[in-house]
Each structure stands twice: as structure tokens, then as C-alpha cells.
A protein has these predicted regions:
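Hydrophobic or amphipathic, alpha-helical segments that drive membrane association/targeting
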Residues: 1-10, 36-47
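Soluble non-cytosolic domains of exported or imported proteins
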Residues: 10, 14, 72-73, 77, ...
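Zn2+-dependent metallopeptidase catalytic core
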Residues: 11-33
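Surface-exposed helix-capping loop/turn segments at secondary-structure junctions
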Residues: 27-33, 92-94, 133-137
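Active-site scaffold of zinc-dependent metalloenzymes
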Residues: 41-73
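Post-HEXXH active-site segment of zinc metalloproteases
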Residues: 72, 88-121
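Active-site recognition of the HExxH zinc-binding catalytic motif
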Residues: 76-89, 123
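Long, well-structured alpha-helical subdomains associated
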Residues: 113-118, 122-137
Length: 137
């Protein structure tokens, strides 16, 4: 079972903890044997969020999301980053040397345009539906 810890302000933490079970279920991460740390702190440079696969070292995935005033923005970023957790858990998305990534066995340079990366295309295509389902439950 996926062990989850959420860090951030009380408001943001409570919100994320409320919608996260639905997101985990939708992405079929319930049986993942790794840990997940979600940090709602301003630690992700220009991105709204970032996901790191630290499972080889710590047994965990790290999701960092910029805290926003609007909860919907946090929720969209969370849904997006959780798609990346799913991609990593299934072994479809892997980090490679020098900031490159492997997607389904194909290497993509760190210079690949953000919106041309297949893992980003998939995450953007799913985030809204995941969020809507999570809010409805």
C-alpha cells in the first residue's frame, strides 16, 4: 500500500489530504509499495510542481507543489504530478543522465521542448478529468 505524507500549511495539507485518496485510486496507485512525500512549499523554481523518483535511494517519490492562494491551482498541479508518479511507478518514465529522460524505452534530451515531452502531454491530458472526479467524490 502507498504510504503518504503531506507537508505544508494546515489549509493546503488538509485540502490535499481530502482529494488525494481519489487521485490515488483513479491512477491505481493503491497497491504501490513505495512511499510518497508531497511538499507544498515554494521549492520548484519556475514550475508549478515537480516530481522526483527517489525510490532507488529512499523508497519514495517526492512531489513538490508551489503553494497557491487558489486551491484549484494546487489541485491541478497535484493531479498533474500524480500522473508522473504513476508513470514512474509503472517504469514508463525514468530519469537518465544529464537531465535526460527515458519514456517507454526512448531517450529524450533535457532540451526537448516541455510541451513536446510525451509524459507531459499525458499528464496535461489527464489532470482536469482526474481533478473533476476527485472533487465529485
Amino acid at each position: 500500500m502507498l504510504e503518504i505524507k503531506v507537508e505544508g500549511s494546515r489549509r493546503n495539507k488538509k485540502f490535499v489530504e481530502a482529494i488525494l485518496p481519489s487521485i490515488v485510486t483513479q491512477l491505481k496507485l493503491d497497491t504501490c509499495k513505495k512511499a510518497l512525500l508531497i511538499r507544498l512549499y515554494d521549492e520548484c523554481n519556475d514550475n508549478e510542481g515537480t516530481t522526483l523518483d527517489l525510490s532507488a535511494v529512499t523508497g519514495a517519490y517526492l512531489v513538490v507543489i508551489k503553494p497557491k492562494r487558489k486551491l484549484k491551482e494546487i489541485a491541478l498541479a497535484l493531479a498533474h504530478e500524480m500522473v508522473h508518479v504513476k508513470q514512474m511507478a509503472k517504469g514508463i518514465l525514468k530519469s537518465a543522465k544529464n537531465g535526460d529522460h527515458m519514456w517507454a524505452g526512448k531517450r529524450y534530451s533535457k532540451d526537448t521542448a516541455y510541451l513536446s515531452r510525451p509524459w507531459e502531454i499525458e499528464a496535461f491530458s489527464k489532470q482536469e478529468l482526474i481533478l473533476r472526479r476527485a472533487i465529485e467524490e
